[in-house]
A protein has these predicted regions:
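Short beta-strand-centered aromatic/proline hotspots
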Residues: 5-15
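Intrinsically disordered, charged low-complexity linkers and terminal tails
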Residues: 14-17, 21, 142-146
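Short solvent-exposed strand/turn elements
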Residues: 19-45
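Beta-strand-rich cores of mature extracytoplasmic or soluble domains
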Residues: 42-146
Length: 146
């Protein structure tokens, strides 16, 4: 996050529905840079958001580092991703699709109240993930659709 604070995320699964990309869960808790919490405690924390990305690219670009491996990934069946057919047309409100990890995409048209809470189903760059972790929102066009 910055030179005094850090947050953690966890790779949980690859989503064949979304280009076989990595799905991560980002935890809300902010730690001081000197803290070294147990991974088993981190993964019990509240999840801020789920997202698709390429985790290895973030390591190569120096945006994050791998600190360990823990098999506990939590329940994933409740995670809903949403995707708009045309992000250039904000005026079109009935072109949404949703899916759950590794399940079929469903064209739903307008988003229901539950589906509006879904996470954007785009494969974000490491820089996009880093920005959202640091600022709480995506930047650019994606911010309009969160």
């Amino acid at each position: 996050m910055d030179d005094k604070h850090k947050r953690y995320f966890q790779y949980i699964i690859s989503d064949l529905t979304c280009l076989n990309s990595d799905v991560i869960r980002v935890f809300k808790k902010v730690y001081s840079i000197d803290e070294e919490p147990e991974l088993s405690e981190i993964v019990k924390g509240e999840v801020d958001f789920y997202s698709h990305c390429v985790t290895s690219a973030g390591i190569k670009r120096g945006l994050w580092e791998k600190v360990g491996n823990i098999k506990e990934v939590g329940e994933i069946s409740h995670i809903i991703f949403k995707d708009k057919m045309d992000y250039t047309r904000e005026d079109i409100k009935d072109d949404w699709r949703i899916w759950r990890i590794n399940q079929n995409i469903i064209h739903v048209g307008k988003l229901s109240k539950e589906n509006k809470k879904g996470f954007l189903g785009l494969v974000f760059t490491p820089e996009d993930i880093y920005y959202k972790i640091k600022n709480g929102v995506h930047y650019g066009f994606a911010a309009k659709y969160e």
